Amino acid sequence: MGLYREIAKLVEYGLQTGLVVSADIRYTINQLLEIFKEDEYEEQEVSGEEIALPEVLDALTDIAFERGIIDSNDIVTRDLFDTKLMGVLTPPPSKIIEEFEDIYGENPQKATDAFYKFSQDNNYIRRDRIKKDIRWKVDSPYGKIDITINLSKPEKDPKAIAAAKNAPQSAYPKCQLCMENEGYAGRMNHPARQNHRIIPIQINGSRWGFQYSPYVYYNEHCIVFNGQHVPMKIDHNAFVKLFDFIKQFPHYFLGSNADLPIVGGSILSHDHFQGGRYRFAMADADMEKTVTIPGYEDVQVGILHWPLSVIRIRHQDEKRLIELADHILEKWRGYTDEDAYIFAETDGEPHNTITPIARKNGEVFELDLTLRNNITTEECPLGLYHPHSEYHHIKKENIGLIEVMGLAVLPSRLKGEMELLADCLVKKTPIEDHEELIKHKEWAEKIQAKYPDINDSNVMDILKEEIGQVFVGVLEDAGVYKCTEEGRAAFDRFIAVL
């Protein structure tokens, strides 16, 4: 029978990856049979077979739909169901925490290596979907910039969107970052998390959680979040928290989104940071100039050669960096320079904040302070220091922490649009024949003029290069001080008040 064989294969996968131990085989089989409302079972010979997890989960979810165990075959319902299956294979939090702490005692990097592998083995991070993401790099005056078209977040079909909209609203868990997600079954408007495990850590004297992002935008993309559902705030404590984590996991960087709309991330309601083990172009950016700040002569300070406006501070004692970061933040929050169109506030609404990123380089701690301002104007209603309308056909979303560091996370629609646009450019057919390409028309005409020899073999490379240059332009838009003589003079005026 197909069901028995697929259950046996799933359990064999658990054995091969260490999710299931031999003493738990029978128990695990019976737990899976219960989900399928199946009273019988016949032994299957699958020992040593190479198991492709996505295929097994697809087959089991198909059976569940055929049997009426799930009432819909859309992507959301299927994900809710196959996560339930993986929850059966996933050991309880206590076991994962114990294993992590044992390995951490030996070596923090080995502990995160093991936890990252586990988070993929149990399908919390869906390897098969992450592989679909399109990634490339482009050269820029600031170094090699990373571009991704994110295809790992599944597109919901209209039926699933309607079901999510009509689902009863619940305040549990309060958001997708809360501790209460661990083991939660999910619903049409909230993902299933039976296979989600959190490592508890102490940050600034309170209980925090450490987990990986299920969408891993870069290597070992982790999320470090407050045990309490409290809002994001960039202040003295935020800097303390960043370095508390870096001291525990010196092989990772950690950063925070800004705490104001437009320049912040998508979740401002829950205090959290994002980090990981990846070398972004920003980390390798050169110091454009070094400066000395009175009272902090022992701290190395410089302006970074980067499209956004970044002050980098370096010292072996992180406490000195926290003190200086406090000083810079306080001055920036209250800073106005009308000539540079920087206003600390208008009509009582604050505009200035910082996107901070901490890391350790050898024995030296480093903190990058990215100056942000969320003022809007009539010409730029979405934000003056935000992607301008000429770039919205590629990127109009907020420039958050990940983008600040030099990684574009672009919408999945671009994959299909680029394929269609490539066809039009090569065949020289009218772009306006395709409604979804009209927004790209001006840009496409510039590409045609720039590359008269565009053809089948070079068109995708050309489009990737030009998308990359659009993103560089987007980052330059987000910089409060432009990389021009005038912009740098204005930056110097701010440095002078420090």
What are these regions (language model features)?
Residues P261-S269, D347-T353:
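Beta-rich nucleic-acid/ligand-interaction surfaces
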Residues W208-S213, A238, L242-I246, T292-V299:
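Structured alpha-helical segments in the cores of large, soluble enzyme domains
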Residues M1-V224, Q228-P231, H305-P307, L321-A325, ...:
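Active-site microenvironments that recognize anionic phosphate/pyrophosphate groups
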Residues N195-R197, H229-L254:
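Helical scaffold of the NTase/Pol beta-like nucleotidyltransferase catalytic core
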Residues K241-F245, H327, V470:
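Amphipathic alpha-helical segments that form well-ordered structural scaffolds
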Residues I246-S266, G275-H327, R333-T336:
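Catalytic or ion-translocation cores adjacent to nucleophile or general acid/base/metal-coordination motifs
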